[in-house]
Structures are given as C-alpha cells and as structure tokens.
Amino acid sequence: MGFRLALAWTLLVGPWMPMGARNSISWEVQRFDGWYNNLMEHKWGSKGSRLQRLVPASYADGVYQPLGEPHLPNPRDLSNTAMRGPAGQASLRNRTVLGVFFGYHVLSDLVSIEKPGCPAEFLNIHIPPGDPVFDPHKSGDVVLPFQRSRWDPNTGQSPSNPRDLTNEVTGWLDGSAIYGSSHSWSDELRSFSGGQLASGPDPAFPRQAQDPLFMWTPPDPATGQRGPQGLYAFGAEQGNREPFLQALGLLWFRYHNLCAQKLAREHPLWGDEELFQHARKRVIATYQSITMYEWLPSFLRKMPQEYTGYRPFLDPSISPEFLAASEQFFSTMVPPGVYMRNASCHFQGVINRNSSVSRALRVCNSYWSREHPNLQRAEDVDALLLGMASQIAEREDHMVVEDVQDFWPGPLKFSRTDHLASCLQRGRDLGLPSYTKARARLGLPPVTRWQDINPALSRSDGIVLEATAALYNQDLSRLELLPGGLLESYGDPGPLFSTIVLDQFVRLRDGDRYWFENTKNGLFSEKEIAEIRNTSLRDVLVAVTNMTPGALQPNVFFWHAGDPCPQPRQLSTKDLPACAPLIMRDYFKGSGFGFGVTIGTLCCFPLVSLLSAWIVAQLRRRNFKRLQVQNRQSIMCEKLVGGMKALEWQGRKEPCRPVLVHLQSGQIHVMDGRLSVLRTIQLRPPQQVNLILSSNHGRRTLLLKIPKEYDLVLMFDLEEERQVMVENLQSALKESGLSFQEWELREQELMRAAVTREQRSHLLETFFRHLFSQVLDIDQADAGALPLDSSQKVREALTCELSRAEFAESLGLKPQDMFVESMFSLADKDGNGYLSFREFLDILVVFMKGSPEEKSRLMFRMYDFDGNGLISKDEFIRMLRSFIEISNNCLSKAQLTEVVESMFREAGFQDKQELTWEDFHFMLRDHDSELRFTQLCVKGVEVPEVIKDLCRRASYISQEKLCPSPRVSAHCPRSNVDVEVELTPWKLQCPTDTDPPQEIRRRFGKKVTSFQPLLFTEAHREKFQRSRRHQTVQQFKRFVENYRRHIGCLAVFYTIAGGLFLERAYYYAFAAHHMGITDTTRVGIILSRGTAASISFMFSYILLTMCRNLITFLRETFLNRYVPFDAAVDFHRLIASTAIILTVLHSAGHVVNVYLFSISPLSVLSCLFPGLFHDNGSEFPQKYYWWFFQTVPGLTGVMLLLILAIMYVFASHHFRRCSFRGFWLTHHLYILLYMLLIIHGSFALIQLPRFHIFFLVPALIYVGDKLVSLSRKKVEISVVKAELLPSGVTHLQFQRPQGFEYKSGQWVRIACLALGTTEYHPFTLTSAPHEDTLSLHIRAAGPWTTRLREIYSPPTDDNCAKYPKLYLDGPFGEGHQEWHKFEVSVLVGGGIGVTPFASILKDLVFKSSVSCQVFCKKIYFIWVTRTQRQFEWLADIIREVEENDHRDLVSVHIYITQLAEKFDLRTTMLYICERHFQKVLNRSLFTGLRSITHFGRPPFEPFFNSLQEVHPQVRKIGVFSCGPPGMTKNVEKACQLINRQDRTHFSHHYENF
C-alpha cells in the first residue's frame, strides 16, 4: 500500500518537479492534513477528526448537556479554593520555563479545540458577588462568557453516541505547529524559493499574519490593540499568544530555513520543492525526537518504552483526557514573569509599556502583544530563549499564579478571565469523567478518602482538601478529573495525569507510519535516525542562535546546580509591574450616533420622496399656469376684460381649482380654463356683501360673503393681484347698488369662517328632509335631525335661498329648461330671483296634497306666461314643449301642432285661440287630466293617433298581482266604455295594436271579451330602517354579499401570505436551533424572515394583476365567477400597500438584527455566517455601517427602500393626480426593483435564495403578457363630439379605426394626449358594433376622469382649438353575445353593470331595423339603480332605442331603490311628480322614457312567473344579469325557484361588477 501511494504521489508531482527533484524524493511525502498517516484508518489523526475518549462521557443527559451547578461547584469558587496560591515557589525538579512553553508548543501541534461550536452555545461562569478581580463592587450579576467548542455533528444524538469534540489540527506529532495543518496553509508560509519558509524584511522573522492565512488575532488584553500587525505567520493558529510561545515558533522557523540553506549548499541542483520536502522531513523528525525522548521524560520523569515499529491497528487519536491533563498541569508551572539574558549570562532589564524597566517580562501583560519593544531583533528573541532556558519554573502542584488564574486573555467583551475556571468548564463541555471513574478505567488503585488523593498535601495543607471536599458536599465521586489530577500532583504529574499523557504519546508514536524511527517508510536510514536521536533542543538553539554550546546547559528542560547562567532569583509578583486590569469591551462604543443617523436617514426616504414629489407638483403647477397664460392670450382676448385669474379654495378636503373671475353688470361669473361657466353669482340690492381679506401668508386670500349663496374664496399669487380684484369688486358692487363691509382676518380664521359648497349641501339636505317630512308625513327619525350648532355660519346657511341654477341642479334639469323657468317663476312669489324654503314648500304641498282643481290651477298659472288669466295655443304648445325638453325628446313643430289641434278638437275648442282655467281644467279632465290624478278614467273618445303612438309601452302591470284598494284603482261604468283601462300611479295598461300575442282587440261599443295575460312589474318596497345598529348590520351584510368574490380571493391570498410568514417564523423560532441565529436575534430574525417570505410572494404575484391581456382572457372563462378580475387594479394597490407595510416591518427586523450583529462577537457571527466571517479570535464584530453599506443585502436593501419610497409616494392618489408623468416614470423603476430584489436575496446571507421560487412563474407570465401588448398597435383617434352630461358624465364620440372589430359589451383603454400618452384607462364601449363611430360614457369619479371632463368641456366660440386626440387600445373583455340565442331574453343591469347592455340594446334594434335574421323576438331590460342621477346618460341611449324600436322588441323597466335612504331633493321630487307628469305624452318626467319608473326593488320571482304567462309558447328564456353580487344572487335565486316548476326554463348568465 505504501509503495502504491508513493508511486501515485510521484506520478502526481513528478511532471512539475525539476529533474533533480524527481530523482531525489524517493519517499512518500507526508500530507499536511494528517490523512493516511495510518493505513488502517485513513482518517485517524486527520484535521477535523473527533477526539477519542479513554473513559465514557459524563453528561447530564448522557448526550451533550454538561453537568453544572448545583450538582458541581461553581468553577470560580473551585478555582479560588483549590488552585489559588502565591507565586515565587520554584520547581521541585528544577524544570525550566523553556520546558513549560515547549510543552504548550507541542500541545498546539497535537490538538486545538479553541474554535467555538456552531450554533453558539454558552456555559457562562457566574462570578460570586464581591469577587476582588471580577466583581469588586459586589453587583452579583457578573458573568464570564464561555463558549462551547466545536463538535462533530454526527455525535450528540443519543446516549450511545454522546457529543465528541473535533480536533482542528492534525492529531500527529508532524510539525503542524510549524508548517500548518493543510496544504494551503503551508503554501502561505512558504517562500517557494530555496525550499525556505517565507520571511519578512528581517530574514530572522517570518512575514506577518495576513489573509487568507487566518491566524488567531485576539486583542491585546493589556492595551486593547487589535489587528494582525505585529503577529507572525506560523503553522499554529495561536502561535502568537505569548512572546514565549512566539519565540519557540521563531526557533523552528529559523531552524527549517537553516536546514534548507544547508541542503541547498550540499545539493545545488535541487529545486525548491525538493529542498523544502527534505528540510521539512528533517525538522519534523528532529521535533519528534526532542519531544518524545527529551521533553517527555523531563515532563513525566519517565522514559517511554522502546520503539518496536509501526502498529497499524493502534488508534492514535487524541483523547480529551490528555488535553485536559497536559494543559492543566502546564498552567501550574507558568511563572509570573520571564527573564531575558544574553550568551554571557547577563540578565537584562525589560522595558515595560509605560517605559519603566523591570526585571523580566510580565506574563499577564504579554498576552497577544504586538510589536513588543523588547523583541524587535533576532538577538532579542535569542535572549528570551536563553532566559527561559535558565529560569526555574513554578512548583508542580495545585497552585497557579494570578497571571493565569485572574488575568488570562478573556473572551468576548471581557479582556480578562479565569483560565482555571475556563478549563473546568471546558472539561464539563468535553464530558470528562469524574476523578474516581477515570482512575478506575485506567487501572489505577481506587481512592476512597479525600486525604488519599495526596497524602503529602493533606499533611502540609489539608485545608485545601477540606475546602474542596466541602464544595463537592464531601462526595468524592463527584470530584472532577481536572481538580483531582491537580490535587494529586506534587513535584511531578500525579499518577492519573502521568498515565494519560504517557499513553497518548506512545500511541502517537506507534500508530504513525511516518514516525522517523520507522525504517519501512523510507524516510531515513539507520544512520540518519541515530543522528536525529542524538540531536537535542540545545543543538537546535546553538545552531539557530550562533552561540557557543557553553552558554546553555546540556538539557535545557532542567537547570541543575553548576549549569551556566543561574537565574538571579525566583520571580514573584512583587518583582514585576502589576497586571493590566480587567476591561469591559463595548462593541457598539462610538457607533450610537452614527447608527441613529443612519436609521433616521432611512426613515427620511419617504420624506425626501415627498419633497421631490412636492417640487415636481410645484413645477407642474407653474408650467400649467404658464400654459394657461399663453392659451388665454389667444383665446380670451375679449373675455379677460375685467376678469382675473385665481385659485378657488373649495374646502379643506377639496383641491383648489384654477378659475377666471369675470365681473359683469349685476353678476359675477366664475369660469374654468376653457371659459365654461362654473358658477354665476347675482348681485341684486338690497343685499349686504361682506368682503374679508387675509392678513397673513402673503395677504393674498379673499373671501366674498353674499347672502343666499355659499362663499367664494379666492387665492391670488400676489397681494397686488388681490388688491386689483378688491377694487374691481368694490366698483361692481357700487354699480349694482349693493352695500358692503370689508375687514381682515388671519388666513386660518378666514378659512374656518367660509361656508363651502359641501357644508351648505349637508345643511340643506337635512333641512329638505324636514320639509318633505311635513309634506309626505315621513317619520321625523327618517328625516334626520337639524344641526344643533347655533353659530353664525349655520344660521346664515339656513337662511339661504335657492338660485335658479341650484334649483335646476336639484331637479337634475338644465337651468334653461322651460319647465324650470315656469316653476321657478311661479314659486318665486317675491320676484327676488331666489326661491325660499317656504316658497318651495308651498309648491310641494300643492303637488302632493292639493285637489285636482288646485293642481290644474297650478299648472295653468305656470304656463300663463303673460299673466292675463288665459292660455293661448302658443302658450299651450310651449307647455308641451317644456315636457318634451324634460324628456330630452325632439318632436317637430308640426307634430306638436298636430297634437295641440287634436286635443283642442276633441274638447270642442277648435274655434278658440285662448283657454280660461275652466277650459283648461275641462280639457285635461276630458282627455289627459286623468293621467295627473289618482282616480280618473278616459271615457267615450278614442285616443288620438299621435298620443297613441307616444303612449305605446313595453311594460304592463297585472291587476291580479296588485291590491285592488279603492285608493289605487278605479273602474268606470262599463256601459259607456269601449276600452276599459286601469289607470293608477302603480299600474297602467295602454292599448297597443302590435305584437300579436299581446294584441288587445278594440271594437267600438263593445267590451273586451278576451283575457290578456299581463306582466307583473310592481316594485317591492322595503321599509328603510334608521336604526344605526340595523344600518351597520345591513351595511355589513350588503358588503359581504357584494364583495364575496373579493373577500374570498383576498382570504386565499392573505392566507397564503400569512402561511408563508408563519412557516418562516415558526422555522426560525423553533426549528432552526442548528443555526443558532435565534439565540442571537430572536425577534429580529423571526420578523425579518417571516416578512421576507410574504414580501417575496406579494412582490412576485403582484405582477399578475397587471397582466391585462391575461385578465381579459380569463374574464371570459368560468373563473370569472370566482375571481373578480375587474378588481385587478384595486387588488394591485392593496397588495402594494400590504407589501410596503411588510417591507417596513422587514426593515425594522433587520435594524434589530444589525444592532445585535454589531454587538455580537466574531465567534458567534462566524457560526451564523460561515461564508462571510472566519473566527480568528479577534472577537470584534463589524460595525453597523458595514452591514448597511458594505454587504450586498444591506446595500441593495437600502436602495430598495429608496426606490419603494419614490414609487409609493408618486403612486399616491394626490401626486398621481398632480403629475401622472412623474407617477409613470417612477413606476418604471419596478424593473430596477426586481433586479435588486433578486440580488438582495441571492447573497444567501442567512438562508438560500427563495425569491425565485415565487418570482419565476409570474415573471414569465408578465413578460409574455407585455410582449402581447407590445405586438398590438395602439391607434391615434380624433374626437368627433364631446358632450357634458348631468351627474358628471362625459360623452365622447370618436372615429372608429379601420379594421376595428368588437362585440357589444367589450371595453377599450384610452389615453388622452393632453393628459399624457402613457396613462391608459379602461371604459366600456356604449356604441353598437354596427355604428361608424365609437362612443364612451365616462363618469367623473377620479382625478383623471375629472380632468378629462374639464378638457372636453364645450368651447365658448368657434375659434377654440380642436379636441385633444386619443390613443385607443383594445378591445378587451367579454362580449355578452348569448342573448341572441334565446327567443326571449331578460337583461338585468344594476349600478355600473348597465354599461355593457347599452351596446347590446343598440345592436339589437339595429339588427331588427335592417331586417337582420335575429332569433330573439323580445328583450326585457330591467335597470336597477340606487338613483337614476348617476346614469342619466343611459336614459339617452334607452330613449334612442325606444325611438328606433319600431317592432317593439325592447321592454324597459327602471327601478330606483332605497328612496328614503337617499332622500335628496331630486329623488324626492321624482317620487312626488313622477306619477303626475309621466302621464303627459306617456313619458317619465325625469328619465324622459316611455317606461314607468318604479321605486323599490324588482320582484324577480313574480316577474318571471308572469313572463311565462305572456310567452307560453317559449320553452327557454335567457336571463343575463350584470351588476353587484347581491343583485345577481337574487336573480339566480329567482331562476332556481322558477325552474323547479315543469314549465319554462330560465337560463341564468351573470357577471359581477
């Protein structure tokens, strides 16, 4: 086997060696890591192998938990009791100090367990209160930290496999303290020139320690000096611990180079590798010989048995008992100081740190010293070696000097520690057996009494044994191996220690096939072996120091009488300077301020982003003003005369809007940027006007208080501009004959004194409720309470009167409508141009409670325009035109004339040109007046054709389904009737001659003999509950009902996110003990890791909410029933908001982590981050700024926080409205965001990267969706028509691109060029697929749609610029195309869900009008809305459908729900007037439609039942509902109930909005 390995080595290194080297290296070169020193077990003795016990382990749990208090005494107490003693007692055998430190050097060559284990475990030593060294202030809370050593992870699993520590160096006597324990370490020590080890500037010294050579570099406990400067590169990590150990390392360094130089002279053809290997094997052999045959006998006073050859079955592994015995015994012989002398026996003085001179080097002040002033030259090192050779060590007993006991280099934050107490803890960490068990296991005689441990000690100092026995409760079986072995030692190691040490060295020698005496390994010849055996340490010293042999005694490990250079005296602590005291290190010292500034800076990121956004907003506002000035110069030449620009303050929660104030005679006009009039204020005497000016903040605010109006607050850029406005106002008020008062207030008080439009509307709403409660007998609780505030502002608001414009707006009509003019003029009794509450109340009383005569008289007075008591034909025509205007209908003048002539002729007034009130009342009574009252009927005369056509309805109400009370129904005498019609406010049947199944046959003079099935459409009205609790419960139920899909999806999403958080949090809290990080930062790591998992999930899947093409596709699948794809943007915002909150928590967790990492010692950090830190004993961790700015996760994390702060601030509602371009540009930082996220987690600082697990799939889908969007061309479109409709709806009609095909019900994305070419918003197309243009109805519900409405406001003249163009992208979404597959279809639209049906209705009518083959014969459209005010634009489309529906295909029903809850003026007027005015021309007053407007909820089940009666031949009816989930759920429930019957099947299809 040896031959084969030698051959393999030769083949491996041969090609790279010089020819001479290949010929000279004839042996198998020994590895540096200890492998293959034993061919039986290759790993024995290798670096990293476990320690091999001589005695079974003794742990508390039998596995790994060490024994401790109270079972065993406190280590510090035991150290003080059994091992404290005075210094200055010489060795009984005259052993020298050189032998002591040579023993430490040999021990460093054989074993090293100083590296802490991972995860970090601590066996801290509690210091008894009042300890003179460590607790002089008697605090009682001092703890000396002790970290357990590294162990084999394959051990410590069970009592049969207890924990075993690992050896960090080779377990062979192979010179690893000289050459290192690995090939790479050795390479760092070599110079690769002449076979020598690398030296520094001085050839006598090696080069200094540096990376990647990880020398042990703790701070100097005496001075606090840190770093590798002044420390040399040795094979042993702790070779620089003391100058004395360092001197021995320098000795062997110089000896190797001396051998290499000698070999180079003898063999000039050898190369570097050959010289190095020959010198190395010679040095190792010499080191083995000196250790085994010179030092060991001097240490044990025993010679090992003769070497008999290599024994492959002998396990040479180091035992923990050997480590404890040897190290502990060495410590008893360490003196308090060490002499230095030259070759002429001159013991020189030593320079201390304070420049004083002392007899010797103080040991306690020499630990880890750097650039020692007494060891600057090679001669100084020689002097130290000579001094140690002549100095007698301390006595070999149980006592230890204070330099070792109290002032040993301390770990972690302590500069000092008790070495003996630490050794005791180390023994417990090793699981060492008790003293008695060890003796028994090693075959030594048992000890049964404390005095038998050391009879000599019992006689001379029995108090020590007694005190020790007391600490162990007189139980000898508890006595530990270390104190027991020390107590039995006196002059020589006791029997236990001697047996352990001798056994270990014999096994090391006999189990090593590379031992220099093994003649079979080919290393040395017999002659060379004999030469090596004859080489002593004295020979080495003489060779290296170039001194004469007479300067040293023959055996440098002893000094006997007559030997050269005796020491002056046995050193004691009195002869030496005091030890530097204990220093508590503060790792965070000096970092508090910077750490706080860093955290404050991170917290200021949002503020900086806010400041940036504010600057951008200001720049945008300034540019906007500049553009306004430029535009107005060309557009408003005439208009600017007497006008001034300003900002109107609308309230604290409302944004200021730029306006133009134009003063005219008797009026103040407030206009927007396109000169559309926003408000007109009438100036009529005798009003008292108050003018309030601000006195601070630049004196640029003005408040105009005019009675009967809400206040006008204007803000100017400069005080001068305000002054000009004040002067103009004063002139205008004087011209109008108005008196005014002027005073000043602070701007804040001025704002509080202003009555805003919103405040007035709230006050008037409550007041209106009380008015209607009196008229309609509504419960006062439903009407609401009047404000209790009695301030001047409230009193002024309650005395306000409605202007003509406000009156029209409250009715939802245009101010110029004739109906508004007529009613306003009639109600304005005092003629002051305003309508008081009492005046309006009088009108309401007549409408609601007046008799038919009173109501007809009111109508007569309304339309008696000239007030002469007569209504002419022209005035009658104007009356009809007023109703037509209300209906937004367009009838020609000829048609109106025909209607009037027919009505006059039927009443017998064909010869009259004017009507008195009696004539007017008779005409209405005889013809259509019945339609205005509750109990009237039409008699004897056929309805005129024009009225018949207008009266044709698509809805019928079955009297069988209604309560036939006398108040709501009336029957005329049948003998006088040709056609009987039931006419009530709730049910109406009009004759029609279309649609054969519904035809009613009319015969003059005959009754209706055939029964016609009628459709039940009566609304189901629910009592509105005013109880706050009931409202809250109902609101919650409706919320859950309407958003059940949203709630379900959110529940799933946040359950996953929460599960990820909990999984990571649980893992790091309870399952990551092997990492040890939770012991360092429990809260911080749980918070940061848990949030990191959730953030990874959220930031990944948030991309799916922006995959518009995918969402468009999925909306057309069954998934749309479970996932609200239309809420993707809202979901995007919600995820983003949650993610930013978690990001803040994640950052907070890492702030805690950084702080704790900054105060954690390097030994702990090297366990937590083995790829980032190497424990070199320096203890000091990296500063906080290193974690923040010099690590990849830290730096990317800071950058991510900055990017997120920018993105989130600019994405907020306010700044998105101020500068959408800023939002768009900053939101494109998401690319950099995801790049940094990937980099942030890829460093694997705490755990392996996991972000890609969540990110990969959504990213691929998102990229694919983006590519689809990029492949689709966006078309630029010109706007053909723009119209501002009531309730903030803007109607845009624009060109249809060539090849643009879509289905009714689909939607598009548009971008207005004036608002930015990159901001797209989705809207449903309200045009039909057959139309040449595309149309949208856009409600101003947000900042973008509001600005769109302003941009497309109607121009004031023909010279204004054309409308801005649009970008069109689409179409998207689901087309509701299934309706045409049913002979009868029911379309149910609720809320915004009516939008897709607008296109469908128009499409159906068109196909019918062009005789297109359409299977569908009848469509019932049910429009359910909270108030029709929100969707007046749909009424226009329905009106268009009605007028084009010549085949009576569409039947429309409108249901307005929750009247009492809404209860505003307009809805209340609708409730009062609808039943009276909808009968005029058979149209609704407010919708302008022929359909009846119902108040309540649609009765779906009765409606579907009656539908079966109306269409008995239809076996399958399609029901399509679109709107809130609550409505579609009711439709579904009704369909299911009807489908239980064996009749018509109702197939329900729904889509929720």
From Swiss-Prot:
Residues bearing carbohydrate: 94, 342, 354, 534
Residue sites binding Ca(2+) 2 per the record: 864, 866, 868, 875
Location relative to the cell: Apical cell membrane
Bilayer disposition of the protein: Multi-pass membrane protein
Enzyme type, top EC level: oxidoreductase
GO aspect biological process, one term: response to cAMP
Catalytic activity: NADH + O2 + H(+) = H2O2 + NAD(+); NADPH + O2 + H(+) = H2O2 + NADP(+)
Primary location recorded for the protein, binned into one broad class: membrane
Cellular component, GO annotation: apical plasma membrane; endoplasmic reticulum; NADPH oxidase complex; plasma membrane
UniProt record similarity statement: In the N-terminal section; belongs to the peroxidase family.
Name of the protein: Dual oxidase 1
Species whose genome carries this gene: Sus scrofa (Pig)
UniProt lineage: Eukaryota, Metazoa, Chordata, Craniata, Vertebrata
